[in-house]
UniProtKB/Swiss-Prot annotation:
GO cellular component terms, A-Z: nucleus
Protein's UniProt keywords contain Repeat: yes
Name of the protein this chain belongs to: Zinc finger and BTB domain-containing protein 24
Keywords noted in UniProt: DNA-binding, Metal-binding, Nucleus, Repeat, Transcription, Transcription regulation, Zinc, Zinc-finger
Domain BTB intervals: 37-103
GO biological process: hematopoietic progenitor cell differentiation; regulation of DNA-templated transcription
Residue ranges flagged as DNA-binding region: 159-171
Biased composition (Basic and acidic residues): 202-219, 231-244
Amino acid sequence: MADTTPEPCGQLMVHSDTHSDTVLASLEDQRKKGFLCDITLIVENVHFRAHKALLAASSEYFSMMFAEEGEIGQSIYMLEGMVADTFGILLEFIYTGYLHASEKTTEQILATAQFLKVYDLVKAYADFQDNHSAPKPPALNCTGTPVVVISNKKNDPLKRKRGRPRKANGLQEGRSELAAEGELQLRVNNSVQNRQNFVFKEEDSVKLSEQTPEDKESEPAGEPGSVEEVPAEKDENFDPKAGDGQESQSRCSRRRIRRSVKLKDYKLLGDEDDQSTAKRLCGRKKRSSGPEARCKDCDRVFKYSHFLAIHQRRHTGERPFKCNECGKGFAQKHSLQVHTRMHTGERPYTCTVCGKALTTKHSLLEHMSLHSGQKSFTCDQCGKYFSQKRQLKSHYRVHTGHSLPECSHCHRKFMDVSQLKKHLRTHTGEKPFTCEICGKSFTAKSSLQTHIRIHRGEKPYSCSICGKCFSDSSAKRRHCILHTGKKPFSCPECGLQFARLDNLKAHLKIHSKEKHTADSSSVSGSNVDEGRNILQLQPYQLSTSGEQEIQLLVTDSVHNINFMPGPSQGVSIVAAESPQSMATDPAANITLLTQQPEQLQGLILSAQQEQAEHIQSLSVIGGQMESSQTEPVHVITLSKETLEHLHAHQEQTTSSVPAADTGARATPVPSTRPGAELTQAPLAVPLDPSPGATVAGWPFGPSSYRSLKM
């Protein structure tokens, strides 16, 4: 009902005595439905959705925490060092003004309320003790557990809640009997009280219509000395449900509860006064928290010595929780549990949109914001929005002048130091993750996990259009782009379009090599002569039958080949470059040198018709010539780029030789081959193809070998 008070100036001031309860009831309904909740509080892996504004208005802890962040806020917070059941009851009090708890948990709830500075509850409990200094035997609920129901209504009869239908008579009678047996009720008005000195205005048991509201100015929230006093409101129609406490307990009992370790403490001006005042309000039954726990290194103050002990590990470097797999230490047990999932590969949280699996629910919630497009983090300098806090932190360097972490080798920049650390492995060659099955090493843990799926034959990611399966989710995403028909990546040199970025990057290398080849043509003849080196291929064994041969596709840039084939393997050489240069160059010859002639079953020369007559000589040391050509099963392509690598070898650097389907790596070694004509050491290329690699039924005919060059 509303009260209308005439004013001398002719204005009316209308006040509703049910508005505050209506707003709180609406917010509580929104919280239960997750509607318009802008913050998630995680306590013992239990997620509580809430409204940030209401938390800040009810708790100085949250108010100060949000004020410290300023405009750079976030939507997910981890509160460690609390019990999920206790925090759930406290959160219900913030939204309803009622506390339903057993006597044995009341002390723990009050300790949490004092820590979070929910002074309305502290005040309500102090009034509760003052009014019941000689309390009656507590009433028992249906389970026989003593229950304390706190509200700020005194000696009011129980009535049904506003707007709700009456329950069955049996339930009403049971609740009346429960109240008659001595259930104590004290309802608290959730208005903002004086947070500094606990100055509360005592209200008599009168109707709100008989009071005159007082308007008082208050300082901004979060500043010392802020005072905003609002008269307490009395709701004559309010009727707490006896089943609310049971419902809350049953809801919390289904949550996964475990011991927490740490909770960040926010130090406010006047905290010492607040603590001493709170002790006086709670009376002698309140257990003293003892002397303050102060860190000697940073002078930070904690309410409990347990939190101080955890905090001091930052200064001492103590990491008591060790990983059994790698020996890495952690300051908190929870951090160790998350780290252990890296070794086990456990990723229990999966994105329902893209199927990506993550190790923690916090990571999943942050990842889901990428799909929803929700950008909860705003830059207070330029107003730009971000979906992740680390993105905002990286962006903030633009305004602060701090540069992003940069690689000293390639000058590439990264969002954080951890990403730079992973990138540096590509330069240093460090591969700390090794496959236990085949011994292959990787620079990233994710690459090892994908590799292990190949051994196991696991392909959990399938294309929804064609059904093709993949062992890596990124490979599936790249594949799905092909079905769209879109080619958003265009070559700036020739305008050729590609559906995938990696294909464009591979294409751009062709242009860069063409430019490099054009520049190298202007090199003096002496340098070219020095570049004509011996390409030494180390022993290479195919995993297939002995009748299959190895085919070398060479160019006019390579004149001598030292190759040691495996047992019962044939070798064929295919000339695949312009005949004009070979005809004009008197040194244009291909020499196959073998150190194990008894293992060479056959040597085959296969060239295009117009090229065969321009090859001046084919020298063979060991082995014998055959005129027939068997079907090629493995092709090793040696193109003009070999000359570039020979120049690099001349400078004592390691470089890669393009080899189709081999992934060959070039390393300089001293020449041990008898009969070497050049003084320079040959370039050794250890060939390591994939197991069972074969190109049987190769689609290119002999006249198309030119297209095989890299």
